[in-house]
Amino acid sequence: MLTKAAIQIGLQPSLPHIVHQFPKMVLPGVSIYLHKPNMEVEWVTAVARNDKVCLGLIVAFLNRHHGLAKIVSWYVIPECGGRGVGQQLLAGLEDWCRSQKIGIMMLELRDASAAYPVATHIFRKQGWKEQQPLVHRFKVAAKTVQNLGWGRYRRKPSGFKVIPWQSVSSVQYAELRERWRHDEQFQREFLSFNGENGIESSVSLGLCQADKVVGWVIAHRIRPDLIEYSTLFVEPGCRASGATVLLLGESFLRLAGTQVVNVIFQVKVENDLMLRFVRKRFHPILSEATLYRTEKLLDRGSTG
Protein backbone atom coordinates (compact mmCIF):
# COMPACT_ATOMS: atom_id res chain seq x y z
CA MET A 1 0.00 0.00 0.00
CA LEU A 2 1.35 3.42 -0.98
CA THR A 3 1.82 6.03 1.71
CA LYS A 4 0.86 9.55 0.68
CA ALA A 5 3.26 12.04 2.21
CA ALA A 6 3.49 15.81 2.25
CA ILE A 7 6.82 16.86 0.73
CA GLN A 8 8.47 19.98 2.17
CA ILE A 9 11.51 21.37 0.37
CA GLY A 10 13.67 24.27 1.44
CA LEU A 11 17.15 25.72 1.67
CA GLN A 12 19.08 25.18 4.89
CA PRO A 13 21.78 27.38 6.45
CA SER A 14 24.42 24.64 6.58
CA LEU A 15 25.03 20.89 6.60
CA PRO A 16 25.76 20.82 10.36
CA HIS A 17 22.36 22.45 10.87
CA ILE A 18 20.72 19.64 8.87
CA VAL A 19 22.57 16.94 10.83
CA HIS A 20 21.49 18.57 14.11
CA GLN A 21 17.88 18.85 12.91
CA PHE A 22 17.65 15.25 11.61
CA PRO A 23 20.27 13.33 13.64
CA LYS A 24 18.84 9.88 12.91
CA MET A 25 18.01 10.41 9.23
CA VAL A 26 21.23 11.76 7.71
CA LEU A 27 23.41 8.95 6.39
CA PRO A 28 27.02 8.63 7.67
CA GLY A 29 28.43 9.24 4.20
CA VAL A 30 27.82 12.99 4.50
CA SER A 31 30.63 13.23 7.05
CA ILE A 32 33.19 13.95 4.34
CA TYR A 33 31.24 17.11 3.42
CA LEU A 34 31.35 18.26 7.03
CA HIS A 35 35.11 18.49 6.48
CA LYS A 36 34.68 20.87 3.54
CA PRO A 37 33.41 24.06 5.22
CA ASN A 38 34.51 26.31 2.36
CA MET A 39 32.42 24.61 -0.32
CA GLU A 40 30.69 27.31 -2.39
CA VAL A 41 27.32 25.57 -2.36
CA GLU A 42 23.84 25.82 -0.87
CA TRP A 43 22.19 23.01 1.07
CA VAL A 44 18.62 21.86 0.52
CA THR A 45 16.40 19.23 2.17
CA ALA A 46 13.34 17.39 0.93
CA VAL A 47 11.32 16.09 3.89
CA ALA A 48 8.41 13.64 3.69
CA ARG A 49 5.87 13.96 6.50
CA ASN A 50 2.62 12.29 7.44
CA ASP A 51 0.93 14.46 10.06
CA LYS A 52 3.88 15.32 12.34
CA VAL A 53 5.88 12.17 11.64
CA CYS A 54 9.00 12.45 9.47
CA LEU A 55 8.97 9.55 7.01
CA GLY A 56 12.00 10.32 4.88
CA LEU A 57 14.69 12.83 4.00
CA ILE A 58 16.84 13.77 1.02
CA VAL A 59 19.85 16.04 1.53
CA ALA A 60 21.48 17.68 -1.50
CA PHE A 61 23.80 20.54 -2.28
CA LEU A 62 23.36 23.06 -5.08
CA ASN A 63 26.06 24.59 -7.22
CA ARG A 64 24.13 27.28 -9.05
CA HIS A 65 27.14 28.31 -11.11
CA HIS A 66 27.22 24.86 -12.72
CA GLY A 67 23.44 24.34 -12.51
CA LEU A 68 23.98 21.18 -10.48
CA ALA A 69 22.24 19.48 -7.55
CA LYS A 70 24.00 16.50 -5.96
CA ILE A 71 22.15 14.22 -3.55
CA VAL A 72 24.39 13.16 -0.66
CA SER A 73 21.86 11.43 1.63
CA TRP A 74 18.52 9.72 0.91
CA TYR A 75 16.73 7.92 3.73
CA VAL A 76 13.24 6.49 4.29
CA ILE A 77 12.23 4.98 7.64
CA PRO A 78 11.98 1.16 7.50
CA GLU A 79 8.23 1.22 8.20
CA CYS A 80 7.67 3.03 4.88
CA GLY A 81 10.02 0.97 2.74
CA GLY A 82 8.40 0.03 -0.59
CA ARG A 83 5.46 2.40 -0.06
CA GLY A 84 6.45 5.10 -2.53
CA VAL A 85 7.88 7.62 -0.07
CA GLY A 86 11.34 7.53 -1.65
CA GLN A 87 9.96 8.21 -5.11
CA GLN A 88 7.75 11.04 -3.83
CA LEU A 89 10.81 12.64 -2.23
CA LEU A 90 12.87 12.37 -5.42
CA ALA A 91 10.07 13.62 -7.67
CA GLY A 92 9.41 16.56 -5.37
CA LEU A 93 13.07 17.54 -5.33
CA GLU A 94 13.24 17.25 -9.13
CA ASP A 95 10.33 19.70 -9.51
CA TRP A 96 11.90 22.10 -7.01
CA CYS A 97 15.24 21.99 -8.85
CA ARG A 98 13.49 22.82 -12.12
CA SER A 99 11.90 25.84 -10.46
CA GLN A 100 15.39 26.92 -9.38
CA LYS A 101 16.75 26.58 -12.95
CA ILE A 102 18.96 23.64 -11.97
CA GLY A 103 19.80 21.66 -15.10
CA ILE A 104 21.24 18.42 -13.74
CA MET A 105 20.77 16.22 -10.70
CA MET A 106 23.34 13.65 -9.64
CA LEU A 107 23.74 10.89 -7.06
CA GLU A 108 26.44 8.34 -6.23
CA LEU A 109 25.59 5.02 -4.59
CA ARG A 110 27.22 1.69 -3.76
CA ASP A 111 25.96 -1.60 -5.13
CA ALA A 112 26.58 -3.19 -1.72
CA SER A 113 23.96 -0.94 -0.11
CA ALA A 114 20.72 -2.63 0.91
CA ALA A 115 18.86 0.28 -0.71
CA TYR A 116 20.58 -0.14 -4.09
CA PRO A 117 17.88 -2.30 -5.80
CA VAL A 118 15.07 -0.01 -4.61
CA ALA A 119 16.95 3.13 -5.66
CA THR A 120 17.71 1.65 -9.08
CA HIS A 121 14.00 0.88 -9.58
CA ILE A 122 13.04 4.45 -8.65
CA PHE A 123 15.64 5.92 -11.01
CA ARG A 124 14.22 3.94 -13.92
CA LYS A 125 10.69 5.12 -13.14
CA GLN A 126 11.86 8.74 -12.86
CA GLY A 127 13.81 8.66 -16.12
CA TRP A 128 17.34 8.87 -14.72
CA LYS A 129 20.32 7.71 -16.80
CA GLU A 130 21.80 4.23 -16.45
CA GLN A 131 24.28 4.03 -13.57
CA GLN A 132 27.96 4.34 -14.54
CA PRO A 133 30.65 2.65 -12.40
CA LEU A 134 33.22 5.06 -10.95
CA VAL A 135 35.43 3.30 -8.41
CA HIS A 136 35.80 0.04 -6.53
CA ARG A 137 35.88 0.56 -2.76
CA PHE A 138 37.82 -1.84 -0.55
CA LYS A 139 37.83 -2.24 3.21
CA VAL A 140 40.81 -4.01 4.76
CA ALA A 141 42.40 -4.33 8.17
CA ALA A 142 45.08 -1.75 8.92
CA LYS A 143 47.45 -4.57 9.91
CA THR A 144 46.98 -6.15 6.48
CA VAL A 145 48.24 -3.11 4.59
CA GLN A 146 50.99 -2.43 7.14
CA ASN A 147 52.45 -5.93 6.79
CA LEU A 148 52.93 -6.03 3.02
CA GLY A 149 56.65 -5.35 3.02
CA TRP A 150 56.40 -1.68 2.13
CA GLY A 151 59.90 -1.17 3.53
CA ARG A 152 61.47 -2.34 0.27
CA TYR A 153 59.69 0.50 -1.54
CA ARG A 154 60.98 3.19 0.80
CA ARG A 155 63.95 4.04 -1.40
CA LYS A 156 62.70 7.27 -2.95
CA PRO A 157 62.94 7.69 -6.73
CA SER A 158 65.59 10.23 -7.68
CA GLY A 159 64.41 13.83 -7.48
CA PHE A 160 61.29 13.15 -5.37
CA LYS A 161 60.53 14.03 -1.78
CA VAL A 162 57.61 12.90 0.40
CA ILE A 163 56.28 15.49 2.86
CA PRO A 164 53.34 15.69 5.27
CA TRP A 165 50.39 17.24 3.43
CA GLN A 166 50.15 19.90 6.11
CA SER A 167 53.67 21.00 5.18
CA VAL A 168 52.63 22.15 1.70
CA SER A 169 53.70 25.79 1.57
CA SER A 170 51.44 28.72 0.80
CA VAL A 171 53.25 29.21 -2.52
CA GLN A 172 52.82 25.56 -3.50
CA TYR A 173 49.20 25.67 -2.43
CA ALA A 174 48.55 28.81 -4.50
CA GLU A 175 49.96 27.02 -7.56
CA LEU A 176 47.60 24.09 -6.98
CA ARG A 177 44.66 26.45 -6.53
CA GLU A 178 45.47 28.25 -9.78
CA ARG A 179 45.68 25.00 -11.69
CA TRP A 180 42.44 23.83 -10.11
CA ARG A 181 40.64 26.90 -11.51
CA HIS A 182 41.63 26.24 -15.11
CA ASP A 183 42.20 22.49 -15.53
CA GLU A 184 39.03 20.38 -15.65
CA GLN A 185 40.92 17.09 -15.29
CA PHE A 186 42.80 18.48 -12.31
CA GLN A 187 39.50 19.54 -10.71
CA ARG A 188 38.35 15.91 -10.69
CA GLU A 189 41.57 14.76 -9.04
CA PHE A 190 42.22 17.54 -6.55
CA LEU A 191 39.50 16.75 -4.01
CA SER A 192 41.19 18.01 -0.86
CA PHE A 193 42.75 21.33 0.02
CA ASN A 194 45.56 22.20 2.42
CA GLY A 195 44.17 23.43 5.72
CA GLU A 196 40.86 21.61 5.23
CA ASN A 197 39.29 20.42 8.47
CA GLY A 198 39.17 16.69 9.05
CA ILE A 199 42.23 15.59 7.08
CA GLU A 200 44.08 12.83 8.93
CA SER A 201 47.47 14.51 9.10
CA SER A 202 49.33 11.42 10.30
CA VAL A 203 48.90 9.58 6.97
CA SER A 204 48.12 12.33 4.42
CA LEU A 205 51.21 13.04 2.31
CA GLY A 206 52.41 15.14 -0.60
CA LEU A 207 54.94 14.24 -3.29
CA CYS A 208 57.31 16.99 -4.44
CA GLN A 209 59.67 17.23 -7.39
CA ALA A 210 61.95 20.28 -7.41
CA ASP A 211 59.62 22.01 -4.93
CA LYS A 212 56.58 21.40 -7.15
CA VAL A 213 53.75 19.30 -5.70
CA VAL A 214 53.21 16.48 -8.20
CA GLY A 215 51.16 14.04 -6.12
CA TRP A 216 49.32 13.38 -2.90
CA VAL A 217 47.50 10.80 -0.84
CA ILE A 218 44.75 12.21 1.38
CA ALA A 219 42.80 10.43 4.14
CA HIS A 220 40.02 11.37 6.55
CA ARG A 221 39.26 9.91 9.97
CA ILE A 222 35.68 8.62 9.68
CA ARG A 223 35.63 7.06 13.15
CA PRO A 224 38.33 6.65 15.80
CA ASP A 225 39.07 3.18 14.41
CA LEU A 226 38.46 3.84 10.68
CA ILE A 227 40.30 5.92 8.08
CA GLU A 228 39.08 6.48 4.53
CA TYR A 229 41.55 7.34 1.79
CA SER A 230 39.69 9.82 -0.40
CA THR A 231 42.36 10.80 -2.93
CA LEU A 232 45.50 9.28 -4.44
CA PHE A 233 47.02 11.18 -7.36
CA VAL A 234 50.40 11.33 -9.07
CA GLU A 235 51.12 13.42 -12.17
CA PRO A 236 51.03 11.14 -15.26
CA GLY A 237 54.64 11.98 -16.14
CA CYS A 238 55.82 10.81 -12.70
CA ARG A 239 53.98 7.51 -12.43
CA ALA A 240 56.61 5.35 -14.13
CA SER A 241 59.01 6.26 -11.32
CA GLY A 242 57.15 4.12 -8.77
CA ALA A 243 55.96 7.19 -6.89
CA THR A 244 52.40 5.89 -6.54
CA VAL A 245 53.50 2.80 -4.62
CA LEU A 246 55.93 4.96 -2.66
CA LEU A 247 53.13 7.25 -1.47
CA LEU A 248 50.83 4.37 -0.53
CA GLY A 249 53.57 2.51 1.29
CA GLU A 250 54.70 5.56 3.27
CA SER A 251 51.13 6.32 4.28
CA PHE A 252 50.27 2.75 5.28
CA LEU A 253 53.45 2.42 7.35
CA ARG A 254 52.45 5.55 9.25
CA LEU A 255 49.21 3.90 10.37
CA ALA A 256 51.21 2.44 13.25
CA GLY A 257 50.25 4.22 16.45
CA THR A 258 47.07 5.80 15.04
CA GLN A 259 44.71 3.27 16.74
CA VAL A 260 43.12 2.66 13.33
CA VAL A 261 41.69 -0.86 12.95
CA ASN A 262 40.41 -0.74 9.35
CA VAL A 263 40.98 1.41 6.28
CA ILE A 264 38.80 2.13 3.26
CA PHE A 265 40.27 3.13 -0.09
CA GLN A 266 39.04 3.26 -3.64
CA VAL A 267 40.44 2.48 -7.08
CA LYS A 268 39.05 3.82 -10.35
CA VAL A 269 37.36 1.12 -12.41
CA GLU A 270 39.63 1.82 -15.40
CA ASN A 271 42.83 1.45 -13.34
CA ASP A 272 43.41 -2.22 -14.16
CA LEU A 273 46.99 -2.23 -12.89
CA MET A 274 46.09 -0.97 -9.41
CA LEU A 275 43.02 -3.23 -9.22
CA ARG A 276 45.16 -6.29 -9.94
CA PHE A 277 47.70 -5.14 -7.37
CA VAL A 278 45.04 -4.69 -4.67
CA ARG A 279 43.25 -7.97 -5.31
CA LYS A 280 46.53 -9.89 -5.40
CA ARG A 281 48.21 -8.36 -2.36
CA PHE A 282 45.55 -6.96 0.03
CA HIS A 283 44.25 -10.14 1.63
CA PRO A 284 41.95 -10.64 3.31
CA ILE A 285 39.66 -7.98 1.83
CA LEU A 286 36.92 -7.45 4.42
CA SER A 287 34.42 -5.97 1.98
CA GLU A 288 34.26 -4.66 -1.57
CA ALA A 289 31.71 -2.50 -3.35
CA THR A 290 31.43 -0.54 -6.59
CA LEU A 291 30.45 3.11 -6.44
CA TYR A 292 28.10 4.14 -9.26
CA ARG A 293 26.99 7.55 -10.46
CA THR A 294 23.62 8.30 -12.00
CA GLU A 295 22.19 11.60 -13.17
CA LYS A 296 19.18 13.24 -14.75
CA LEU A 297 19.05 16.20 -17.10
CA LEU A 298 16.14 18.42 -16.14
CA ASP A 299 13.88 20.36 -18.47
CA ARG A 300 14.05 23.68 -16.67
CA GLY A 301 11.09 25.06 -18.53
CA SER A 302 8.48 22.81 -16.91
CA THR A 303 7.67 20.75 -13.82
CA GLY A 304 6.41 17.23 -13.38
Feature names for model-found ranges:
Residues 75-78, 111, 233-236, 267:
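Structured beta->alpha junctions
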